[in-house]
Amino acid sequence: SLERNDFIEGLNLSDAGTLLEKFKKNNLARLELQSNVHLEFPYLDILSLSIRGELGWISDNKVDSFFHFYCGGMTGIKGYSFYSIQGTKKLFLDFTIRAPVFSGKHYKIGWMTFQNSTLGLINQLGDAWDPNKFLLKKSVGIQLRINGFSFYNFPTAIELEYHQPITKFNNKGIEYGPGKNRNNSKTYFKILFDF
């Protein structure tokens, strides 16, 4: 997509003493590609493999960071914070192997009925970078999904994930990744209508 952006850079005072916005042009071309593939393992019908990939490119490397790709947090490499990985180029790969815990059951707990559950192992890698600063970041995680209904007819999907960063790096003076004196793992909990 071609974007024409007038991005507010600051405020000035007019002769009358009112605030006037100061804008800067941040025009750019943005290209994003995404793909998902879901496979079953031969001879192991209970295991499935999901592969998700994303590529991104922004034409102007000096564009304001507001327009950058962010490749951490819930939408990216989950072992890192959302704003920790950013840049005008993006590469992201997610490999998830899932096995059923139970399937086709009706376990009732209060107003909820659970029908299916899977356990997954996740390996993620990628980066969002500015030119000549590419460093492949990696994260591993475990995922529990439970699917069913609440209040007899509302589809309910519950997901709990735990992720551990593997790659250590520094972004704007802040250190991310594994450390001796800190636990940088991330936990994500979602309740949705579907996965």
Question: What residues fall within each predicted segment?
Answer:
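C-terminal transmembrane beta-barrel domains of outer membrane proteins
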Residues: 1-195
